[in-house]
């Protein structure tokens, strides 16, 4: 598979559109300097890659065997023999609820996110991919299904079923209901959320029997924001915390 004209143009559009859309509301962000740094790092890398592509004699190859998933101590690798199928950046909310007691801890009740296709980006330009999640969490959730200023195609959606099962629908690539197999704290250097929330843990999720297209595992890595407050003080009932993350899908 070779790099498509669409992918190159997507990077170029993201760079040219930055001054006008979308706006970055620094007054609403707990760490404005960190937000500006994350966004500027993303655009600088995009500009470098667009310039490099324009001077290449041929197109770089989208070889998924070359992609290297981020790792963190304590999180097991994919099962031996697994093959990478898809990589997406998820942008959405982690959902929690409080029972009315100020001293109790918020209870996790699921998540909702739109998934944006960064598969070839992860294979060819991993340093750019790693900046997308860090950048995206600082921009408003958008009804037009855009991940901040990046013009990335939507590859699917993530949500929890009525039975509380994590579910990923990535279109033609398949559907994967799954269950948590392992968890590891996000690195201390992870991007915080818009109002200072710590990054949610990295996860390994294993498919249940109803998964399709041979999908076997999902990894949540490179997380930004999403963690709840330590207690339910001043909170009652359901609430949401915005987050972004990379999701890596592996087949058996």
Locate the predicted segments by residue:
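Primary mode marks residue(s) on the alpha4-beta5-alpha5 output face of response regulator receiver
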Residues: 21-94, 102-252
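Fungal secretory targeting signals
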Residues: 1-23
């Amino acid at each position: 598979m070779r790099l498509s004209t669409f992918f190159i143009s997507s990077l170029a559009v993201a760079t040219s559109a930055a001054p006008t859309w979308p706006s970055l509301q620094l007054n609403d962000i707990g760490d404005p300097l960190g937000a500006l740094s994350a966004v500027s790092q993303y655009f600088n890398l995009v500009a470098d890659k667009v310039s490099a592509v324009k001077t290449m004699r041929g197109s770089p190859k989208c070889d998924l065997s070359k992609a290297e998933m981020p790792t963190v101590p304590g999180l097991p690798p994919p099962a031996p023999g697994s093959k990478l199928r898809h990589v997406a950046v998820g942008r959405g909310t982690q959902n929690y609820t409080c029972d009315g007691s100020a001293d109790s801890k918020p209870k996790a009740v699921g998540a909702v996110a739109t998934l944006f296709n960064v598969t070839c980006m992860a294979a060819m330009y991993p340093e750019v991919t790693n900046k997308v999640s860090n950048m995206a969490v600082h921009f408003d959730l958008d009804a037009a299904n855009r991940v901040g200023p990046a013009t990335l195609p939507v590859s699917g959606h993530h949500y929890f079923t009525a039975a509380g099962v994590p579910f990923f629908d990535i279109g033609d690539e398949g559907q994967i209901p799954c269950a948590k197999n392992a968890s590891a704290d996000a690195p201390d250097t992870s991007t915080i959320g818009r109002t200072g929330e710590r990054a949610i843990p990295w996860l390994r999720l294993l498919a249940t029997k109803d998964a399709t297209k041979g999908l076997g595992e999902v990894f949540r890595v490179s997380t930004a924001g999403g963690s709840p407050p330590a207690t339910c003080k001043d909170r009652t009932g359901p609430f949401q915390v915005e987050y972004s993350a990379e999701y890596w899908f592996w087949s058996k």
